[in-house]
């Protein structure tokens, strides 16, 4: 939509490219390349305060063009920072399909955070790694994280896969604090889920003990009391 591609910077503190406060409203599709995104295709750098309202459809074309589709950045590598971006377009792809980010390549193992972003568009895939915010990361577990992001769009895949979630599409992506899943959305396999002790006062005949997540924070229950 805005930038076709850039590759630079092998440290998370190095951003030789910055895309800031840009808007795309045009529809996108790719039949040959790395896939479509409203703001940047194959990209290394920072993306801040950008908005996409265009629809992306990469369900036709070569196998390569069907791999990465997203509302903001389709395929990221090396130093990547996505902050304060919003997608409201419908995102339709095959594999590595995300409302904000399609895939983070292995790169040099730099830590990356997708933060303060919102997806309001539907996200549809046909294979593995489909998510409302970040679909996939090839880096070591936890090096890529999603924090303070909101997904309000329905996420679906026509393929049989457990790699699908309202926030992330792979367990290699860590979930930080402040993430929100919109009311009424279907729970998906990779969503943060409580252990079933949501209401410690409802079970009056037994003592509740355990640990669960609430709004991205760990809650400890001991003898029916939350800590």
Regions found by a protein language model. Give the residues of each.
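C-terminal outer-membrane/trafficking sorting elements
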Residues: 198-227
């Amino acid at each position: 939509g805005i930038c076709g591609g850039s590759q630079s910077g092998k440290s998370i503190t190095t951003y030789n490219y910055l895309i800031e406060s840009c808007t795309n409203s045009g529809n996108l599709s790719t039949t040959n390349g790395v896939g479509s995104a409203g703001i940047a295709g194959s990209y290394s750098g920072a993306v801040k305060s950008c908005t996409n309202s265009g629809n992306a459809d990469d369900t036709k074309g070569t196998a390569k063009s069907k791999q990465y589709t997203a509302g903001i950045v389709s395929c990221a590598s090396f130093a990547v920072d996505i902050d304060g971006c919003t997608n409201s377009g419908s995102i339709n792809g095959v594999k590595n399909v995300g409302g904000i980010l399609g895939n983070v390549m292995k790169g040099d193992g730099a830590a990356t955070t997708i933060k303060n972003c919102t997806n309001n568009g539907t996200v549809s895939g046909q294979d593995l790694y489909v998510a409302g915010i970040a679909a996939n990361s090839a880096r070591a577990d936890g090096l890529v994280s999603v924090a303070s992001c909101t997904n309000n769009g329905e996420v679906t895949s026509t393929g049989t896969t457990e790699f699908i979630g309202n926030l992330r599409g792979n367990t290699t992506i860590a979930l930080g604090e402040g993430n929100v899943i919109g009311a009424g959305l279907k729970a998906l396999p990779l969503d943060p889920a409580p252990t079933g002790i949501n209401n410690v006062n409802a079970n009056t005949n037994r003592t509740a003990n355990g640990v669960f997540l609430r709004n991205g924070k760990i809650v400890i229950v001991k003898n029916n009391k939350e800590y």
